[in-house]
Amino acid sequence: MLFRSFSGKLDSNPFYNEVLEIAREENSEVVPICARLEEEISDMSMEDKMMFLEEIGLQESGLDRLIKAGYHLLGLLSYLTAGKPEVRAWTITRGTKAPQAAGKIHSDFERGFIRAEVISYEDLIANGSIAAAKEKGLVRSEGKEYVMQDGDVVLFRFNV
């Protein structure tokens, strides 16, 4: 459930607790969003937005929380590819195996799938580069049965 508030003070909103109770009864979740806050941060740079959110005790915007909740509800995840022309996120359903994920990029990738070189986004960021992560053995070679994970950074090897 999405709960839209014009004030950032959810505790003082008499309807918020009612919505939480309904969500609990329906085995659902509530994503509170403050319209004024979202409007304020929409024009900020990423750096200013993160500083502002940290100052008010939040780690991410309501919009980001809404997107994550939507992905969870729909059973979706994202994986990343990085090459010379672009870095891109691809959306797939949970449980998708590597060859089918490769097919989202191009049907030839699925047809000629050999393997996927995979590293988690967190490991990549922590190490600064794929080369540094490879030195530590964090880049894995996965086969046709590998089930893609949210945040995988992948290089698909294929031959057609």
Feature roles, as predicted:
Residues 158-159:
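Short, surface-exposed secondary-structure boundary micro-motifs
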Residues 6-83:
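Canonical P-loop GTPase G-domain recognition
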Residues 15, 35-43, 86-155:
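Nucleotide-binding motor/catalytic cores of P-loop/tubulin-like NTPases across gene-expression machines
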Residues 1-2:
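Short, small-residue-biased leader/transition segments that mark boundaries at the very start
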